[in-house]
Amino acid sequence: MGIVIKDNLFYIHTKDSSLIIEERDGDLLLKHLGKKIEAYHFSNTVFEKDHAFSANPVADNRNYSYDTQRQIFGVHGFGDFRVPSLILQHDNNDLTRFKFKKAKIIKGGIKARGLPNPHSSESAQSLALILEDDLAKLRMTLYYTAYDDNATISTFVKFENLSDKPVILHRALSTMFDLPASHYDVITFQGAYAREKTLRRHQIEQGLFKIGSNRGASGHAQTPSLILTEHDSNEFYGEALALQLIYSGNFQAFVQKNQLNEVRLGIGINDDNFSWDLQANQSFETPVALITYTDKGLTDLTQESHNFIKRHIIPKNFANKERPILINNWEATYFDFNRSQLLGLADEARKLGIELFVLDDGWFGHRFDDNSSLGDWFVNEEKLGGSLDSFIKEIHDRGLQFGLWFEPEMVSVDSKLYRAHPDWVIQADQREHTYSRNQLVLNLANPDVVAYIKTVLDKLLTENTIDYVKWDYNRNITNIGNGRTYLETQMQSHAYILGLYNIVSYLTTKHDKVLFESCSGGGGRNDLGMMCYFPQVWSSDNTDAIARLPIQYGSSYLYPTISMGAHVSAVPNHQMNRHTPLTTRGHVAMMGNLGYELDLAILTKNEKKAVANQIKHYKKIRSVVQFGKLYRLINPEVGINEVAVQYTYDNQVLVTYVRIQSTIEMMETTVKLRGLDADAIYVLIETGQIFSGAELMYAGLTIDMPQGDYLSKQYYFIKK
């Protein structure tokens, strides 16, 4: 059973882990979060004693303090001086003291209203822990859902105003919990535009370690997740805990080590630009957070996260569906194209075995550069040489699927939409606009804007046979000030995200056969919130094969390969001005959902033959990459000059190795494979050589490479 209640103990069990909570005198205390325990008898009791300067909420007990108890929801104002979970203003203060009232076991999953949620299953079970502050007349319900097919717990919080007066939320985390003192590291995934998801590992010291975004989106610079792990853990050893937020807006995540070396973790909506007006009898629900645990190292944590996302996050109709190999015209043409050029690109793509043609920015309004037309989602027939419908038909007649680029959340000042509705943009009254990429952001907190976007895009998707949509978001939000009051303005950032989810939920439900790819200048909104609706993410605008290695490597820790778009582009690369071999560009792009983004027509005969062979090969290994278990064999951040990853699926094994820089007088690299059947025989398809699983895992595979920079090698094995 996923949920068990025994006396004053609440057990939340996954297939391998347990979260155990004690109710004591109305307080909820965390007793264990880790390896599965069926029966708990307080072996790790916190010995209570009088700590100096620790406040005591009970007058006659100097040994009991919220400052030293391990909690699952940090109280505010009664002696817990750590980061609180909640700040809620009522009357003349923001003190809250919630006490436990009752618990309920619920079959299946519980969904947060208006927000993305994991898909539930019949075997899932949920626990509702209901607490109330009788003085302030507030109710707080903590929801936990356990999944028996995974080591993940999903959780969120619901706040209800039971009083007859309004209250204001200033902080509302999705989850928070305290862990015993130990030597911990925190892993985060940071970066910037065109270098997203770079792995960073820090040792936790006393104080506060915090990441977040206040950009209106999850952003390129940080990811709404963190991993807490034992200091000496590695890929295949040690305890690790992942905390992820299913949300696409402003977020915060933190690890805090207090004066007693106890550690608190939390994740949720960022306090910056957030408050929420909770009127009498109204409620507020936080985004859902995920807690994933392993005691088998970071690779196992990765595989648990990948499995959960594929089973419970990615839309079901695409979770187990192979992704098409695409050609995107952006780096081939940018804004400068006509019908003849595009059809020529499609002809070349068809000959090479590509399956999907994507028409990127520049097909609508009078858009010949990035100065105009966002919001005017009607085809420029003069530029496209006819109607959109006729162009799509020509693509389909070539045996290719058709995809189209949109940026629905944005508007250009030079557009019919802006001239008709200048009040629809995010803008503080009497302030000048702040531009980015020459565009403004539509106010998705406005129901009229939401209705307009839904209507326009629904019409386009209904009237045209579009197989794929690339949904872009090319700037962050500034000048927030559309509210009639300051409080209403503080609600705008979260209301924007709720409006976004309203739109994408509607469109992806109605057009459920369309493959949507999320993009924000690459990975500027690469998060689980978007992934609940869009099965694929353009993980970076950087298409350079070498620059992509740490981006894709970092992405792999929590996000499955099938969610990641990766393209072969021209040399010199348009972002890095680097020359890399076509073979290496292909191998790196094959670490994700393979695509091409270059002018195929100008390739030499030999290059076209090489691309055709890449595509033919990828079609053989596509299921291994997109559905297989991933093992990281060499970390580019540690190995400096090389990276190696392995995918295993059914009886197939694929190893991809990339050398970044060559060195003189060095022995060849040997990598030890993982997760094989030690007693089985594996055939290397390229040469016909045979190896035992034990040999490949324990002796290793020596990489046979010539001298030179930016070289790569793939090894494809079949288990006999």
From Swiss-Prot:
Stored PANTHER family: ALPHA-GALACTOSIDASE C-RELATED, GLYCOSIDASE FAMILY 31
UniProt superkingdom: Bacteria
Reactions that this protein is recorded to catalyse: Hydrolysis of terminal, non-reducing alpha-D-galactose residues in alpha-D-galactosides, including galactose oligosaccharides, galactomannans and galactolipids
Active site per database record: D472 (nucleophile), D541 (proton donor)
Gene coding for it: aga
CDD domains: GH36
GO molecular function terms attached to this record: alpha-galactosidase activity
Organism annotation: Streptococcus mutans serotype c (strain ATCC 700610 / UA159)
Enzyme superclass (EC): hydrolase
Family matches, as InterPro entries: Aldolase_TIM, Alpga-gal_N_sf, Alpha-glycosidase_related, Glyco_hydro_27/36_CS, Glyco_hydro_36, Glyco_hydro_36_C, Glyco_hydro_36_N, Glyco_hydro_b
Assembly notes: Homotetramer.
Keywords from the named record: Glycosidase, Hydrolase, Magnesium, NAD
Protein name: Alpha-galactosidase
EC number from the UniProt entry: 3.2.1.22
Cystine residue pairs: none
SUPFAM superfamilies: (Trans)glycosidases
